[in-house]
Amino acid sequence: MATRKDTEEEQVVPSEEDEANVRAVQAHYLRSPSPSQYSMVSDAETESIFMEPIHLSSAIAAKQIINEELKPPGVRADAECPGMLESAEQLLVEDLYNRVREKMDDTSLYNTPCVLDLQRALVQDRQEAPWNEVDEVWPNVFIAEKSVAVNKGRLKRLGITHILNAAHGTGVYTGPEFYTGLEIQYLGVEVDDFPEVDISQHFRKASEFLDEALLTYRGKVLVSSEMGISRSAVLVVAYLMIFHNMAILEALMTVRKKRAIYPNEGFLKQLRELNEKLMEEREEDYGREGGSAEAEEGEGTGSMLGARVHALTVEEEDDSASHLSGSSLGKATQASKPLTLIDEEEEEKLYEQWKKGQGLLSDKVPQDGGGWRSASSGQGGEELEDEDVERIIQEWQSRNERYQAEGYRRWGREEEKEEESDAGSSVGRRRRTLSESSAWESVSSHDIWVLKQQLELNRPDHGRRRRADSMSSESTWDAWNERLLEIEKEASRRYHAKSKREEAADRSSEAGSRVREDDEDSVGSEASSFYNFCSRNKDKLTALERWKIKRIQFGFHKKDLGAGDSSGEPGAEEAVGEKNPSDVSLTAYQAWKLKHQKKVGSENKEEVVELSKGEDSALAKKRQRRLELLERSRQTLEESQSMASWEADSSTASGSIPLSAFWSADPSVSADGDTTSVLSTQSHRSHLSQAASNIAGCSTSNPTTPLPNLPVGPGDTISIASIQNWIANVVSETLAQKQNEMLLLSRSPSVASMKAVPAASCLGDDQVSMLSGHSSSSLGGCLLPQSQARPSSDMQSVLSCNTTLSSPAESCRSKVRGTSKPIFSLFADNVDLKELGRKEKEMQMELREKMSEYKMEKLASDNKRSSLFKKKKVKEDEDDGVGDGDEDTDSAIGSFRYSSRSNSQKPETDTCSSLAVCDHYASGSRVGKEMDSSINKWLSGLRTEEKPPFQSDWSGSSRGKYTRSSLLRETESKSSSYKFSKSQSEEQDTSSYHEANGNSVRSTSRFSSSSTREGREMHKFSRSTYNETSSSREESPEPYFFRRTPESSEREESPEPQRPNWARSRDWEDVEESSKSDFSEFGAKRKFTQSFMRSEEEGEKERTENREEGRFASGRRSQYRRSTDREEEEEMDDEAIIAAWRRRQEETRTKLQKRRED
């Protein structure tokens, strides 16, 4: 093995050359990239000893291995020459170059963008991180980061049913067992987020998982990864590309719109490859579909026929277009680009082959149109061996079955007639005539005449054009597409010529002149003339006229033509009646069919009738939907004006509505809508007033309001255009009227009150707005059952509860008088101002009575419960009479009890702003005398009352936000609900008894001998009423609008100078604290009841402040006495108050429950 020389040199330290060789051997045997400088055995500076695995102990052994393994050592030395090595910079630059070249590589058969372009599209102007942890990037597909995937509660809230973990075991460490109990299906894909990782192997599996989750389970899928920007995004994009046929850029941008994704470049490269593969597969599929038939328009665009039929189908499905609309658009796009289906040479070759094979069996072909029918309709079933042709035929059959089913033989006979009548003309000329008209025909009609053309070309020489079913259908389809190609070229050529010469060329041809004539005569004949008409008059047509044109397209104007009568149709631009081609029931397509037959010289109405059968089934859904809409609107009109009994046919057949539809009648609709809409407000008013009078047993018929002069069409109908203009005028006038009324409301309640009665008939809706003052709830409470009373929104006080139970007769009477005649019917052009004035006076008298009583009660109850007025009343102590005080308290307590017992409507009367309330007082010092005083006196009192309302230091609801005009407005509107609570006037008697829950309290000389029991009673009453109103609020569907306005806002917004705030008494604070603690058990009701108390107290203070201005001295003395009574009651134990209040609350609850059951 070793020579002598080798043995001698054994002890020599290896030379440089040997070192190089040793390194090479090490690299070869050990694959050790950088051997240690020191030997592991002896720490000697010898590299050979390091190679323990092959036990080389000397440089000789290394040399021998080098000699054996690497024959020319010189070459190795040269390769290691430093001059030959690339520097690190060069290597980096080269690597960068290679990477950029890969990223910019856009070599693709299908124009797939390069990776760099994809990255630019994703980054756009800046790179973003996702805003949210989870985003829904496709319906029911969520991309999320790790934190969402491990948050089971959030998954449950999102409704996730499937989880695709793109970082299974590589970042998101969950698994099927992690989601046990959540009914979540899990698929984990173990992929690292590195460019060199192959994620494409998981594309198909992940996409199928997503597809199954979405389609089979109708679930929601969460695709999770570490950050939700790379791996998960790539899997979702692959799903969109595979199952939704998206191109790579479209799929990426679809996801990017919803979430900032940034797949790494390796993944983008794999998506590119997937895109190429999918495009190739689809091209092969399309090639199989149309390759045999040679009917391809280009790469994967489908057959010409398929495109046309698709266009037809899309148009049919489009709601805003008819089944004929848009046909000219389709024509333009198809004809503007001459379509090259196959090369001419290729076509010639195929044609020759076809002729050879076809000659054998030509004698077996039937001699009428049935042969072509069997060729087309029988082909799919009989020639299953040829899948490609079968596919095309099935597509054709499924989409055109309604045309093929009945008509081919008739078409054949028709074509024969055409040939006889047109014997002198050549086939080419015939074809040119057809293609002339093709630029103007609809998509569906185009399909028909293509078939006819094929028939016609088949007929002259059956030996050349026919073949039996057993023949190769491929060649027949080639021939057919060849003819189709010729037709299309001619059509496009003709189309371009026409577009240049406009209609000048049309005049030269029969078809062109006919088309122009039709276009002038009627908008309803052909879809393409519709298109031209609309494009020419696009700027002139209103929305209504466009709708009418659409209606003609839909064929509704011809609905009743089967009987032979034609209803006049006022045109959009030209009011020319629609021509009736025949007495047959026609649709737009059938109209075209007849015209087309006239063009080519024959007319076959039976065929058109046959076509109608198929077409009706095709358009059934759409027509059914329209008819249902029309029927529904007709029923709505009939219900709201039941006098009108006009037929649906006349309304649907013509674009007009009978005059009788607009006369208000005896309506029966229940108004639960938003009465802010002008027309609905008026109609609700009229028919609800009718309902109210019926309930009262005094039903009267609503007087009909005369219509303005409208242009009347045939059959006593009105043109819809004129109706539209007229309605616009009425609406604008009504709006102006409403604005004027609102201005009146802000000026004086007596003027404003004319709105209270009609509006009152609307059942407790959230009428117009709180400021506008239509307190329509006032009568609503009478109309509704007790348990359903709807409290109209606003910050009413406790006492606003009507005592309708105690005064049914009065409420009925006021109902009848208030609403038996509607002041405004649906389209009121004239208003009886005298009647309004009379009603206003009656109402105002009632309101003044009720409000004076109410005001007294409120003040009494308020001052009984609060010592806030103590300081103000000291000065004018002497002026007040005891009688008034007793009367106040009496009425107040009675009203409390009545209101808490009768869970009738909580009306919208707020505490009736201080201005109006004090005006009621101003007209007389005695409440009893108020009943007779007139509106003029009331108004004069209003004018003299200019003192600002009193502002408290705890202003309650939105009172502080209103200016004087809105206070007046609110007063008027809300006090109207006291119309029927007349029974309170009996409570003026200072010795009257009032009953609540079988509890009789004698409140005669209350203030001379007030005791702690009475104080407790008052607390009990006030609190229980708050509770009662809040609990009744539960059952009412109407929202309550309670606001707590801070005192500062009231001071800022009130236009009048402020009075100094009165100090808050300890007694009131006690009451408030106890009410807070008691109401806390009511949860959300607590703040409502408290603000309820506050608004009430605030209204009372305003009223009291106004009264204090020198008007009601006697009342003031009693108030002062009441305040001193309150001071006595301050010593009362809070526990007693709470106990009494709770007892009262329980009683109220039981009563409410009973009332609900009743």
Curated annotation (Swiss-Prot):
Keywords: Cytoplasm, Phosphoprotein. The modification Phosphoserine is found at residues 377, 509, 985, 1036. One of its GO terms (biological process) is negative regulation of MAPK cascade. GO terms for cellular component: cytoplasm; sarcomere. GO terms for molecular function: MAP kinase phosphatase activity; protein tyrosine/serine/threonine phosphatase activity. Residues 435-444, 974-983, 1000-1012 have a biased composition (Low complexity). Residues 132-280 form the Tyrosine-protein phosphatase domain. Residues 322-337, 897-914, 952-966, 990-999 have a biased composition (Polar residues). This is Serine/threonine/tyrosine-interacting-like protein 2. InterPro entries: Atypical_DUSP_subfamA, Dual-sp_phosphatase_cat-dom, Prot-tyrosine_phosphatase-like, Tyr_Pase_dom, TYR_PHOSPHATASE_DUAL_dom. It comes from Homo sapiens (Human). The gene is STYXL2. It comes from the Eukaryota. The keyword Phosphoprotein applies. Residues 1-21, 280-303, 315-337, 360-392, 407-444, 492-527, 559-582, 597-622, 873-915, 940-1135 are annotated as: Disordered. It is found in: Cytoplasm, Myofibril, Sarcomere. Belongs to the protein-tyrosine phosphatase family. Non-receptor class dual specificity subfamily. Residues 8-19, 877-890, 1126-1135 have a biased composition (Acidic residues). The modification Phosphothreonine is found at residue 433. Residues 500-517, 600-619, 1044-1056, 1064-1079, 1094-1111 have a biased composition (Basic and acidic residues). May be required for myofiber maturation.
